[in-house]
Amino acid sequence: MATAILPSTSGVIGLWDGTTDGKEGFMDYANGDTNVKQPKEYEIQVHDIRKLDPQPTLLKNGYELVDIPTVVTDEQFIESGKSDEGNAYIKDVYFAECKRIIEEVSGGVDLIIPVSFRMREQKGEKESTTKKLGNIESRYAPRPVAHLDRDTPTAITVLEETVGKEKAQELLSKHKRWAQVNVWRPIGNPATMWPLCFLNHDRIPTWNYDTHVGHVWSLNDPRVSDRGQKTYDCVVKHDDRYDYHYVSDLRPEECLVFCSFDSIPKYAMPHSAFWDNNVPADAPNRRSIEVRSLVFF
């Protein structure tokens, strides 16, 4: 029997390329000093999640496409970055929506704690977006390098910041599995430019944070104010066995729910914005919002 050819697109993704001196990576956001090489770009084939059968799910694969609209308007999303009132509205109304989405997708979990959100907007073409990686201004742009939001030590850091060390220890003792779950949604237009890509590692049985992640230690990091403390970023290393998945023309009425950290590495989902070689020349700039929640199963 012939093997079915999955609908896909071709594109470019950035992955860890090490440091200039062979030491642990660092980035000083105050002056731009770093020993981290620019991400190495790889040509990839990216399969459309819409066409996968069976569909990946949060519980089985660590990521899932859902069709759940929001009551928040485009203007209210955009206002969140302009005023304290707009920020508070997102944390009140949209955080509650994201909790309900996670509850529905997971079939019910013990505890969901929304902790932060990030608005992103793509400005400029592929080259300008890639070159700005690591600059302060790039923190609100799509990240064209494969990464995980956190690993175990840095996830414990944000947990302790959020609930305190004593409560954190209580939760960790009670739950065998916990994760940071992101709800990622386009704003205004479909996410055609710089779509989000998942690096499925089901074919890598030994995949874990130690073997497939490089560290970039942060100094004077301006992102602390909106994502919490994190001593280093987790940049993903290349492996020929990754399967790359995305959603074609993800609509604002849809969202992607995925584990950006999981205490069981099998479910931790490396992800990245990627350059789609087949993106229409007139595709609109990409705006998106992601809400990060600590989830205890």
Swiss-Prot record:
Keywords: Oxidoreductase. GO terms for molecular function: oxidoreductase activity. It is an enzyme of class 1 (oxidoreductase). Its EC number is 1.-.-.-. Signal peptide: none annotated. Pathway: Secondary metabolite biosynthesis. NCBIfam families: CmcJ_NvfI_EfuI (NF041278). Oxidoreductase; part of the gene cluster that mediates the biosynthesis of squalestatin S1 (SQS1, also known as zaragozic acid A), a heavily oxidized fungal polyketide that offers potent cholesterol lowering activity by targeting squalene synthase (SS). SQS1 is composed of a 2,8-dioxobicyclic[3.2.1]octane-3,4,5-tricarboxyclic acid core that is connected to two lipophilic polyketide arms. Belongs to the asaB hydroxylase/desaturase family. This is Oxidoreductase R1.
